[in-house]
Amino acid sequence: MGRIFETRKATMMARWNKMAKVFTRISKDIAIAVKAGGPNPDSNSTLRRVLQNARAANMPKDKVDAAIKRASGQSATDYEIVLYEGYAPHGIALLVETATDNVVRTVANVRMHFNKHSGNLGTAGSVAFMFQRMGVFRLNPEGLDLDSLELELIDHGLQEMGEGVGEKGEKQIIIRSAFADFGQLQAAIEAKGLVPVSADSEYVALNPIELPEDKATEVLELVDALEQDDDVQRVFHNLA
């Protein structure tokens, strides 16, 4: 087990420091999960995972319950997940994951952000091949026998396991699987009584690119602008 290399997060995860935006994103995730599998987390593994992320973000229980109730109602908003691809300045590839109830509005806004920050919104498939979609779990390492855990999870889809750092600088164990094995690995982790700090699918850059600080800052300004958009859930890039 080694240290997992992760692309720069200085602003990639900036929204997690803006609580209202965090809760909006999670509320949409709840709505999508409930729509797909119902409001009971015991029988809906996707919802169960989203609720774990809500707890990790310190989302108040009343807000979580309200989001589930709204998503269960007949007038619930029907969100569509749309992935946009493009380039930031200096050839850095971006994947922009959105959850929208108005695709026309969303694509116009995403294009505006790219244009304003010297980027280029591309077509489907233009940069997706530079990433691998994976299931990513982050665990608190306290009390874990990491060698034993790694051996046990290999049979359930584990591909990579290594050390990482959380948003507040805390140590974490990062576990990755192929996206197709996400559910299987989630079940194996839960069967061991472990509660992940977070669990989600992510687009992991295959070949991260290093840039000088001044050029990297230009890229991250576009990433930050996209992340502030109401329809954008997450932004992935291959900036090292």
UniProtKB/Swiss-Prot annotation:
**Localization:** Cytoplasm
Known Pfam families for this protein?
TACO1_YebC_N, Transcrip_reg
Q: Which keywords fit this entry according to its UniProt record?
A: Cytoplasm, DNA-binding, Transcription, Transcription regulation
Superkingdom of source: Bacteria
The record's principal subcellular location, in a coarse class, is cytoplasm
Query: Which InterPro entries does UniProt cross-reference here?
Result: Integrase-like_N (IPR017856), TACO1_YebC-like_2nd/3rd_dom (IPR048300), TACO1_YebC_N (IPR049083), Transcrip_reg_TACO1-like (IPR002876), Transcrip_reg_TACO1-like_dom3 (IPR026564), YebC-like (IPR029072)
Extract the Gene3D superfamilies matched here: 1.10.10.200, 3.30.70.980
Annotated S-S bridges: none
GO cellular component annotations of the record: cytosol
GO MF terms listed in the record are: DNA binding
BP terms from Gene Ontology: regulation of DNA-templated transcription
Instruction: Return the similarity comment.
Output: Belongs to the TACO1 family.
Q: Which HAMAP family match?
A: Transcrip_reg_TACO1 (MF_00693)
Instruction: Write down what this protein is called.
Output: Probable transcriptional regulatory protein MXAN_7062
Q: Which organism is it from?
A: Myxococcus xanthus (strain DK1622)
